[in-house]
């Protein structure tokens, strides 16, 4: 069944189909994620609006049983800053892929759509893309059926203490209950504290974020552990982010040599 709708929409990715056509995966606010067919994409009037990480209002023919079609568009927002920086673009691509993996196609999820687009808008504004990604990863866990409490000890329910995380109990332990899990994570107390903050933070109150490099690295490693143990997905875009550390080191070495 085909129906015409107008909706705010974000392009997740596109891929070549046949000689000059494209299949475009788009997350729409009203109709969820859909695959669109664009004929003669290179010279199509739709070319500006089918590029990855492009936000626009689309007039669409949505098909519940097959490919959908874009009829017209307006208010294109291309995220220029993101697309001009390899590192930011990698993180933006990853959060988009994570959103794609978190819900079935054709399932409307206006809250997730708003969360994803706001994450990209804050990256575009220049807020720390790594920390924004961490916040996104933590808050989207519920879409994968994962609920973790970083706020209170799983045994005594006290708050505001130097917690450590236990995979055995899927929650945090206070110092009095560290003994309950010999294989607890031995995290820096700032890590559970920050994850508790990330779970609760609202973007409307977020003006600036800044963390030391070693804390950011520990956050990255621990969130990776959470996704490995509880979610079990392995996205190509995440593997690319992991490889960026090597590229960053190469670029820094080159800059240091040129400055000597």
From Swiss-Prot:
Keyword DNA damage annotated: yes
GO cellular component: bacterial nucleoid
Keywords: DNA damage, DNA recombination, DNA repair
Pfam families named among the record's database cross-references: RecO_C, RecO_N
Biological process, per Gene Ontology: DNA recombination; double-strand break repair
InterPro entries according to UniProt: ARFGAP/RecO (IPR037278), DNA_rep/recomb_RecO_N (IPR022572), NA-bd_OB-fold (IPR012340), RecO (IPR003717), RecO_C (IPR042242)
Recorded family membership: Belongs to the RecO family.
HAMAP family: RecO
Name of the protein in question: DNA repair protein RecO
Organism: Streptococcus gordonii (strain Challis / ATCC 35105 / BCRC 15272 / CH1 / DL1 / V288)
């Amino acid at each position: 069944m085909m129906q015409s709708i107008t909706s705010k929409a974000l392009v997740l990715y596109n891929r070549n189909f046949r000689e000059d056509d494209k299949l475009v995966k788009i997350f729409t606010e009203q109709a969820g994620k859909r695959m669109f067919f664009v004929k003669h994409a290179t010279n199509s009037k739709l070319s500006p609006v089918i590029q990855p990480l492009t936000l626009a209002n689309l007039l669409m023919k949505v098909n519940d049983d097959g490919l959908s079609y874009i009829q017209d568009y307006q208010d294109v927002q291309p995220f220029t800053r993101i697309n001009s920086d390899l590192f930011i673009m990698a993180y933006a691509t990853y959060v988009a892929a994570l959103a794609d993996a978190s819900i079935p196609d054709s399932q409307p999820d206006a809250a997730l759509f708003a969360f994803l687009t706001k994450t990209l808008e804050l990256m575009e504004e220049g807020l720390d893309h790594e920390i924004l990604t961490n916040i996104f990863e933590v808050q989207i866990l519920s879409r994968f059926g994962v609920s973790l409490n970083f706020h209170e000890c799983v045994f005594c329910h006290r708050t505001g203490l130097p917690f450590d995380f236990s995979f055995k109990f899927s929650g945090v332990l206070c110092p009095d209950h560290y003994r309950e899990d010999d294989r607890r994570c031995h995290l820096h107390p700032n890590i559970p504290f920050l994850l508790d903050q990330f779970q609760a933070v609202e973007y409307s109150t977020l003006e600036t974020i800044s963390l030391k490099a070693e804390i950011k690295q520990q956050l990255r490693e621990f969130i990776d552990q959470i996704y490995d143990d509880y979610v079990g997905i392995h996205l190509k875009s995440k593997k690319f982010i992991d490889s960026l550390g090597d590229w960053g080191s190469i670029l820094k070495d080159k800059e240091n040599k040129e400055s000597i």
